[in-house]
C-alpha cells in the first residue's frame, strides 16, 4: 500500500519560493523568469498537487543547464487578433509564455468589455 511518510520537514511558503527562485537563477534564468516558474510550482505545492510542484525544480534546472531548454528566451507575440494572441516561447518551458499569453488575453478581454 502506498502510504505517506509519517514525518515531514516543514518549509514555509516564502522559504520554498526563495529556494526555487535561487535554483533557477543559478541555472541561468533572470529574476522575472525564475520567480514566475518558482511561484507557479510553489502554488501547486500549496494546493496539494505535488506532482506539478517544486519536485520539478531539479529536473528543470538540469534541462536549462544542459542546454535542452532555453534559460534566456525571447518570449514574444508573433500574431494577434482582437480576442487572442500567439506567443513564441523561444525554446523555454511553457510557464513564462503562458503567463504572458494570459496577461494578453486578459487585456484583450477588458478592451472588449468582458
Positions of predicted regions on the chain:
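Active-site cofactor/substrate anionic-group-binding motifs, chiefly glycine-
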Residues: 52-106
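Generic N-terminal amphipathic, Lys/Arg-enriched alpha-helix
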Residues: 1-27
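Glycine-/proline-rich flexible loop or hinge segments
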Residues: 21, 44, 48, 81-91, ...
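Conserved catalytic cysteine-centered active-site region
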Residues: 104-114
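Flexible, glycine/charged-enriched surface loops at secondary-structure junctions
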Residues: 29-36, 51-53
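A non-catalytic, amphipathic alpha-helix used as a structural packing/dimerization or gating element
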Residues: 15-19, 36, 104
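N-terminal and secondary-structure boundary signal
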Residues: 4, 25-28, 43-50
